[in-house]
Amino acid sequence: MEHVLPGQAPIRDFVHHNTLHGFQHLPFAAALEEAERLTGIRGYLPENEFRALHRKGRIDDADIDTVLDRHLGAAGEEILAVAGGEPVTRRQIHRLRLTVDLEPVDPARFTWLVDELEALDRFDPEVSPEARRRLMESAKRGRGEAVASRRLVRDLWDACLERLGLGDYTASHPEDLLGHAIAHAEALYADFKAESSGGGLSVSHRAMREEARALLAEEIDAVGREQTLRGFILKLTGQDVLDRVRPQLIRHCASHLDEGLAAWHSPDRSLGFYAAWKRSMRHGAEGGLGEVPLGHAELDALPDDPAEVVVFELEQRGIPLPYWEGYLERLALELPGWSGMMNWRAHRPLYRANRTAPVSLMDYLAVRLILDRRYLGRICSETWGIGGHIGELARYFEAHLSEFVVRHALYCGDLPEFLAATCADLVRRAGCERVDRKPWRVAADMIFSWRHAPGAGRDLRIRLHGSGWRLFKLAQHLGLSAHDVQALSASEIERLLCALDELTPAQRGYLWLCAYERHYREPLFNALASNHGRGRWATRDERPQAQIVFCMDDREEGVRRHLEELNPAVETLGAAGFFGIPMYWQGLDDAEPSALCPIVVIPSHEVREVPRPGEEAARRLHDHRRGVVRLLGRVFNQEIRRNLLSSHLLIDLVAPGVAVGLIAKVLLPRWAATLSRWLADLWMPEVPTTLALHAADDAAPAGPEQPRPGLTDAEQADRVAAFLLNIGLTQGFAPIVVLMGHGSASRNNPHLAAYDCGACSGRHGGPNARVFAAMANRPQVREQLAQRGLVVPADTWFVGAEHNTCSEEITWFDVQDIPPLSRIGWHAFAAQLDEACRLSAQERCRRFASAPRRPSPARALRHVSTRSVDFSQARPELGHATNAAALIGRRSVSRGLFLDRRVFLISYDPTRDPEGRILEGILLAAGPVGAGINLEYYFSTVNNERHGCGSKVAHNVTGLFGIMEGAASDLRTGLPRQMAEVHEAMRLQVVVEQTPEILAAIYRRQPPIRELVGNGWILLSAIDPGDGTISVFDPERGFVPWAGAATDMALCGRSTDWFEGHVEPLAPALIAV
């Protein structure tokens, strides 16, 4: 079941991942179709949004033509009809099907289009000028004179209906058509009465029963495969049992999973969810006061083993054994957030919260099934006087088919108002068919006759508002006049209309996506080809003034670019932000260690932050005062909510201060944050710290099961050497080498971890940078590196730092250890980095709606800094929004390009990796990280309400592990709308500087890479290290040369010249180097 449930961790440990991780073994398009079949969630942007992107120029005609040619091949040139002397090909029809809304319309919308927009007298607004011209010229030739556009369009409509044999309805107002259905239904019912007066059943009634019997069998068979009993009952009563179950179930789930928000906890949490629930129902008020109380005898009868409960409940419902798995899967998907969290915790028994509250998905399903049975049984008993067994329901409705028809049509169908009102009144008055059979039979026969009435109901909608409307719009966009339509043969019209449905909605979505991706990919490839040979540091012939290794994060692309523009002698590199140091980290104030590494890695070592020698007294004072702050926090956050006496006193006491603080946060957030930071520093002065990272050479072996404090000299040298080799930094070391981790800081932001470093399990990467620098500076490590042929000059000093991607602040670590000779160079570099951050803030402001237009760098920095401390700000930063590509290679490939902060930059030197072994490791480590980020943003963008978690405005934090909307919603997973609203939903385009042959060999060797690349979850291309030629990977053909060609590009003196004044995504541009 894990493959269909959300795999999101608790929100404090948020790590980006593929939302459809359970379908990753399938090709991308097939996976989206299978997920939609199972969950009903579409995996592409709505077509109207794609069409809006086409109108804006984010997708152009060449993109659409290219993907259609690839999809159709030679079949696209097949001639379907000859109209107006011109052939109409399948490719033309498919192209119009993509770019124009050619869906059938329902009668109500048709009425609105005719009455309000005069759709039968005016051209479709989206008809191109060329098509209008052809249409008007054709009409003039056909009539021998010019025709007014209103008359021309009306004639076209009449001609379409005439060719489809619908001419009888051209003069009728759509609302009048309802009268045909009513009259026909009444006539059929009169026949029924006449035929049945002789004691038999009418022909129409017998037909209705046969149709009903088939539908009933279909619905019964779907229980366990496509729906649960809840869905079946919902279709027949309009009552959703989940509305009654959800509040009770969620209350218990939230209490059991709580990680620190609740003031009280159940004393039985350690027994597991099911056992704790049973005890709560027995001893708590809810067991006796619930809407459907569970008595002690019934609770005692329940097995202690939740698995036995699940088996018992499924048998009680009459679900066939082969359908059990599907039934439980459907049941879990009715509340996927809560089911997914239970499942996530169940698969991670070592998770810290499981120590006091173990979790099992079987526990959850057992409780859900018990509650379902109680409420389903009540509905069935009150409505039909039977239990909630699928067999009883089947037998009842087999004997009362008329009632089944009426109820199913009322709650699932699209009945006209006169029939819906009749059926609703019947359900309300009669209750069920066993009370009075006649009115149910009358209503069922009327429904049947309405559905099968010629010229009315569904038949008319399919033909008039379907074929007629679609042919009418299609003719306009093809430039066909009434004369041209009348000249078409019946077979030609049929071929044209059939061609409109040859592309399924999923296929159209995939074609649009491919066109969207191509529109981004072609300028990117053009930029890389045009930039070949321009960038510095391809060979590092001269020594850089400074080197800085950033995380591969796309948000760092802008800072790197601005820094290089400020000082071309600086070399920037990129890598996964844990810097090759997987570890458990425990900061000075941390209660327990946290893993700082990719989520798939389990660390074997632990590193602690400790006070520097001589700072013991400062540490004791710090701990004492921090203890006071924590005590006050517990009193304010929990005691005030649970103690009757103290809550009254404390509320009166703290209310004035809270009011003043709230006003300051709202009106003066920057000033309030500064004051708060000053008071915190005054009360708890910072303790100078160092790292406890060394372990003796004879220390016990380290492993994931028994993490060991510290690393030996050899282990430290192993990690430093491997990382430097991976990024290609094995010679040409600068005097200052900075390791720049990153994190994000903002207020009132439950999704804070989603802005942090994905390579550090959703936490800050500064500690990893600090640890790496400390290791690389140790003489013992340098000595071992030299023995391995990796010589680091004596005057090179590594410095750890952390970049706040929200406020653009830089935090430096252990600067007091920088040697005096290196300190001058570090000061100069730090000043340049600060200026680069100001320029980065200026670039970011162009995408914020509330930011000043064209701000100076200093003003832009103030703005982003204020956003980071404004607790009312729903968009403190935009995170990874707009990420679209990853570039693995030397910085010379991309240096000198404006990439709009959309590209993950990962350093790799192909000239030092002839067999691709280093690249193989990079792809295995960084590939899933980049793909996880990209795919989570993709799915949260295409359907934010289902794959994402909706707007932050309605979110409530639940138990410090998740968010809900209100107090009784599902647990929301994915990204909030404010994080994804500017994102362009497309798959990650990975470009690797290496030969296609080496990449193909890696692809064949590594199943994880084959799954991601071969199934199309990410897109792979190669750029040759020698001549810069680009090859694109096709899962069916392998690497094929890029079909495009380098064209002239804009050349700018600096990035500001390109982005200033623009708020939209920008294409790459060349920057002077």
From Swiss-Prot:
Main location: membrane
Gene giving rise to this polypeptide: dabA
Similarity annotation: Belongs to the inorganic carbon transporter (TC 9.A.2) DabA family.
A cellular-component GO term for this protein: plasma membrane
Key words, A-Z: Cell inner membrane, Cell membrane, Membrane, Metal-binding, Transport, Zinc
Cofactors required: Zn(2+)
Topology of this chain in the membrane: Peripheral membrane protein
InterPro entries: DabA
Residues bound to Zn(2+): C551, D553, H742, C757
Subcellular location: Cell inner membrane
Record keyword Cytoplasm present: no
PANTHER family linked: INORGANIC CARBON TRANSPORTER SUBUNIT DABA-RELATED, UPF0753 PROTEIN AQ_863
Organism: Methylococcus capsulatus (strain ATCC 33009 / NCIMB 11132 / Bath)
Origin: domain of life: Bacteria
Name of the molecule in the record: Probable inorganic carbon transporter subunit DabA
Subunit structure and binding partners: Forms a complex with DabB.
Alphabetical list of Pfam families matching this protein: DabA (PF10070)
SS bond list: none
Task of the protein: Part of an energy-coupled inorganic carbon pump.
Single annotated GO MF: zinc ion binding
